[in-house]
Amino acid sequence: SDRHRIWYENLSYFSGFDLRGWEKKSQAKLAEESQLLIKGSRYLIIKGDLHSSKVSSENNRFVDRKIFGFLSELGIKENKIGRFQWDSRLIYYQDQIKLKNSDSEYASAYGIKNSWLRFIGKDGRIEGNIDYYFADGPSQIPPEALNGIANGETIKANITASILLGRSLSLNGTIFYLDNLRYNDFFKIQGEIRAHF
């Protein structure tokens, strides 16, 4: 069946513990997401938001800045309960960036993001995502802009697997890859064994 969600978020963060001066961040977002049935377990996904953020600090510890923009996503997902699930979306983000004592500049990003989940029997699962973005903006894009996407090309991939070993142990592993302007071919492998009592 079709589903529609509309929500509003307003967040504020204030820190006064740093001897160098206080720091204040605020964010507001009005968002909408629709899930429209195409056929069977396949859905059309439409998502968008209007957002703003503001960062200020004492003694100019950070460059005071304001951001106004929008986010849009369009894609298809398929949910087969207990089997293979996937979600693929095209994205376009745009932000207006206003730095203190500077003219407003614009930044935009487009790309595709894919996620999937596969159940392995009753006790295991493997899930992952592969994303590609291209952002075009000023040389120094604040981390709040474009949903955190860095300037230029970004390739990000993540695979996580978990399996239960009996009733008290689980084995988990993660492989993570990131390549963008900030991190050049960053690669991370992590594994853990958890005991449940």
Which residues does each predicted region cover?
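Exposed, low-structure sequence patches enriched in small/polar residues
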Residues: S1-F197
